[in-house]
């Protein structure tokens, strides 16, 4: 059995780790980086993921997708999606099931299908490191993700060819990374996780007793639509508004210009974590009848902080609420862990320190802690990590709609999972033969104000006066936070149950089709790579052969020279096509035709008393591989 890898599927960046002995290790990707941008680009020939996708974003803005995690498991009509539609350069569209999907080159793609491309890159990164196939993973999600978002993340794993053994909350994973092996007893930590697109705060108690560590989540909260992207958007809006004041041109109408501004805004935000001011310079950003326009703007750290102070303040309000839910005071928190790239911002660090009255820990890598924790959980599931018990919670209350449009809660938020809870209900009318069980998730009293997870009917109830039949409704939440609901007529014994898949989401058939598409694309990608390698080999041989013809001079007969040059020309023509077999055949033809050339070059070298040159071979892998990598990355 292979390893269970840990994946932090982030909004902005993703990371993969694995247990290496008794420690978790972050794995570098093919580009040598420890994190991979969660960016996917669709070009005419291939699908790019990570840094190669990011590099071409400016010239391909409508087909370069980022921050897809903000769409996963969301309805198109939701307020969050409608807000994103206005600022994303790519097209967000309504799927037939009501979900938010993305339109790329005329094809509608589901967020899990897009996220699967990032997961496939993480999977391959791990496989290249381990030297074996990887089929199992622990994937992290924001603690405040609802059921639909968790299901969609599991779907993304399936499409990527991964058996998702566990979904684990990001702050809990960070706590595992921080606390594993610690000898301290009964410490309570706060994990403040402000990532690219989501914000979580969890209060976690770590106990050490008789050699066993218990990580118990006391309370969790947050906002699944607050993160670095929102900070970036404030800077983007400021830059665009200032340019509009000066030039009376709105750059929001130009997708390519908007992408350039986005990159500059992110860069400026990062620079202002260490500098007091930065210059945004974007020459030739646009043009009008009077000629090209250049964007030049100075942004100070004070200005950035003024633009985003309400976002930071809202995170502190969530912090207060979660501490109250955990029944803990500020003085009872031993350590504060900052997770997520946005926590590098000095204002964030300052406000968190002011709230707790102490500085956060500096020895936890905010970009890698979550993936490391996921790998630890993978080790626990595999049996490689022993004496560790993880007790997570459900982030939102769960219940059903009852008479009058009220939500009746069965499982309160911050209940430790896995858990099971039953409650008996009855009919609202005389002789009612069926009841509809409408499953809800949220904290509001009015059913319509909460998230609808789905509904089902229990039929065949015996006629009786209202209030007489006894309908037992049971909620069962597994360790992934995924919900099963059943309803049973205690009189007849009839039972109906469903695994909640929300009123939206992907059906099993759609997931299987996407898995097949992914496999087909993997085959197409492999063939494309083989063709590129063959082309590079052909180019190297053609170049070397022409050079040797020149070196041979008169030692090569005119007839042989013409024959070799004709073979090289045919090879160059074949290299422009897509047929790998033809390219390889033409390579062999050049090698065969070049035999008189090699003899002539060798004879000339012997006359000069020099060394015998080696024939340009189809096995000159060192040059070919390097050329291939460069071509692929810069596409």
UniProtKB/Swiss-Prot annotation:
Induction profile: By stress conditions e.g. heat shock.
Biased segments, Low complexity type: 602-617
Single GO BP term: protein refolding
One function term, GO molecular function aspect: unfolded protein binding
Start and end residues of each stretch annotated as Disordered: 602-635
GO cellular component: cytosol
Keywords per UniProt: ATP-binding, Chaperone, Nucleotide-binding, Phosphoprotein, Stress response
InterPro entries: ATPase_NBD, Chaperone_DnaK, Heat_shock_70_CS, HSP70_C_sf, HSP70_peptide-bd_sf, Hsp_70_fam
Residues with the Phosphothreonine modification: 198
Function statement: Acts as a chaperone.
Family to which this protein belongs: Belongs to the heat shock protein 70 family.
Protein name, UniProt field: Chaperone protein DnaK
Biological source species: Haemophilus influenzae (strain ATCC 51907 / DSM 11121 / KW20 / Rd)
Top-level taxonomy: Bacteria, Pseudomonadati, Pseudomonadota, Gammaproteobacteria, Pasteurellales
Primary gene name: dnaK
């Amino acid at each position: 059995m292979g390893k269970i890898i840990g994946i932090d599927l982030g909004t902005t960046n993703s990371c993969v780790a694995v247990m290496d002995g008794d420690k978790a290790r972050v794995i570098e990707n093919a580009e040598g980086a420890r994190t991979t941008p969660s960016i996917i680009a669709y070009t005419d020939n291939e699908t790019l993921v990570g840094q190669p996708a990011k590099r071409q974003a400016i010239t391909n803005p409508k087909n370069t997708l980022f921050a897809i995690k903000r769409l996963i498991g969301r309805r198109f009509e939701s307020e969050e999606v409608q807000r994103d539609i206005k600022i994303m350069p790519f097209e967000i569209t309504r799927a037939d099931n009501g979900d938010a999907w993305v339109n790329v080159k005329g094809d509608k793609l589901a967020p899990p299908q897009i996220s699967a491309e990032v997961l496939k890159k993480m999977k391959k990164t791990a496989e290249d490191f381990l030297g074996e196939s990887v089929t199992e993973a622990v994937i992290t999600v924001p603690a405040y993700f609802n059921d639909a978002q968790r299901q969609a993340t599991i779907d993304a794993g399936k499409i990527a060819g991964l058996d998702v053994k566990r979904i684990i909350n990001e702050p809990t994973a960070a706590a595992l990374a921080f606390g594993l092996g610690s000898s301290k007893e009964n410490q309570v930590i706060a994990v403040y996780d402000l990532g690219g697109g989501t914000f979580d705060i969890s209060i976690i108690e770590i106990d050490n007793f008789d050699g066993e560590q218990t990580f118990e989540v006391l309370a969790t909260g947050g906002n699944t639509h607050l993160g670095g992207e929102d900070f970036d958007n404030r800077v983007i809006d400021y830059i665009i508004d200032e340019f509009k004041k000066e030039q009376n041109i709105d750059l929001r109408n130009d997708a390519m210009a908007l992408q350039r501004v986005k990159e500059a805004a992110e860069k400026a935000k990062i620079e202002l974590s260490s500098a007091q001011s930065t210059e945004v310079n974007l020459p030739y950003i646009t043009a009008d009848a009077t000629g090209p326009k250049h964007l030049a703007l100075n942004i100070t750290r004070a200005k950035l902080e003024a633009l985003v102070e309400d976002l930071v303040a809202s995170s502190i309000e969530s912090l207060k609420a979660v501490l109250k839910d955990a029944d803990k005071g500020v003085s009872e928190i031993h350590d504060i862990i900052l997770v997520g790239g946005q926590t590098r911002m000095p204002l964030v660090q300052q406000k968190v320190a002011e709230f707790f009255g102490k500085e956060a820990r500096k020895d936890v890598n905010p970009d890698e802690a979550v993936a490391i924790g996921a790998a630890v959980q993978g080790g626990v599931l595999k049996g490689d990590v022993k004496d560790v018990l993880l007790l997570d919670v459900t982030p939102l209350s769960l219940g059903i709609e009852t008479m009058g449009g009220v939500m009746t809660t069965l499982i309160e938020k911050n209940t430790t999972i896995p858990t099971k809870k039953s409650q008996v209900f009855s009919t609202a009318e005389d002789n009612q033969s069926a009841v509809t069980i409408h499953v809800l998730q949220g904290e509001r009293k009015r059913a319509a104000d909460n998230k609808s997870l789905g509904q089902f009917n229990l039929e065949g109830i015996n006629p009786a006066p209202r209030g007489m039949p006894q309908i037992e409704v049971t909620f069962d939440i597994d360790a992934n936070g995924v919900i099963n609901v059943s309803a049973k007529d205690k009189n007849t014994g009839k039972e109906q149950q469903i695994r909640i898949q929300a009123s939206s989401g992907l059906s099993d058939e759609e997931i299987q089709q996407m898995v097949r598409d992914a496999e087909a694309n993997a085959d197409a990608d492999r063939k494309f790579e083989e063709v590129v390698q063959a082309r590079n080999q052909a180019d190297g041989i053609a170049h070397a052969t022409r050079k040797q013809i020149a070196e041979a001079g008169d030692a090569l007969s005119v007839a042989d020279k013409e024959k070799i040059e004709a073979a090289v020309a045919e090879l160059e023509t074949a290299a422009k096509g897509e047929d790998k077999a033809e390219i390889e055949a033409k390579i062999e033809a050049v090698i065969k035709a070049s035999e008189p050339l090699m003899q002539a070059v060798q004879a000339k070298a012997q006359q000069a008393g020099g060394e015998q040159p080696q024939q340009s071979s189809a096995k000159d892998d060192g040059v070919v591989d390097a050329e291939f990598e460069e071509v692929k990355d810069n596409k």
